[in-house]
């Protein structure tokens, strides 16, 4: 029985038994940490070797005919538009001076997942890596190995050949996570708006994250989408009611997200993104007006710390990160005006803002970004108008590949919010146009 038939049989058995919840994919893992635990992890600088566009010579049944590969701290990510698939891998030099690249692959909307193990074919490249060097790729660079199904040791041939460099994307195009790595109905093993899901989002293609901000009874901004604590989002015997009616202690003490994660505060989220990832920014979706002032204070404090960090004598310590307060409704706009006045009265620098529903207000409010819904169309004239005033455009929320293609080609935006980061990254690399850098007017 093949893997797909096996999963179908499991689903039928579950239905026959009267199961109440949907199936969940188990995230595969090598026994005892695989070969990575036997080697020395490649440094961040060495991982850039793997970035580029690849031809899939063997294994196209899983990854399609081509892949985009990007890296982040400790991670090599294989990204494709086939079934929104991705592979999250680590890389290490083994004692015999071979370089292994291994981890897992997954289709987030399906129950299909498996292990991946690849090898750097060119021995001279592997030797250079093991000697601490940071070689660059060319068209002779290849990776070969195998992929598997479930937790089975990989046995199906996989061969990748580097073909060209990636288009510029860092600082240009913002593949923006829709409150996490996947949608709530997916099978990624991490809940929307959790620290775990935002960490995973970077590993599957995102370089900005949109997160939802609400306020507790005692005025603490927390990450939560809905006003109420529904069973589809949280678990906990005493986890009931509305976010706004609970103190942060009650919320964190009584509630967990679907996969057991703690509900983070905005401060925890921002700290994690800055300190643990290479995210370039955060799109802070203000769900209620009451969240605006305390959120603005946190962002202003972070910006002050980053400014000091970026002005010291150590350029390797620099960290470029922009968190923008998203003005989503007239209620939030009024709260934004009040927050600005309060911060200015206290001598605090007002943080950047993003306006969702009117491009003219982006300009008049002095915001750094426009965040229109995709349902109003690609609006290339408005995209250009705000660009001429130094602002960028990030559309929300597009998960269908055909619409991604249309918006990439017609609007040339600086970003799109999506729950399909791997597909968006691949499509930007294959058919997108590199937009001007934020702040450029030409």
Residue ranges, per PLM feature:
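Bacterial N-terminal signal peptides that target proteins for export
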Residues: 1-7
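C-terminal motif of bacterial Sec signal peptides marking the signal peptidase cleavage site
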Residues: 15-18
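Phosphate-group recognition and catalysis centered on beta-loop-alpha active-site segments
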Residues: 20-442
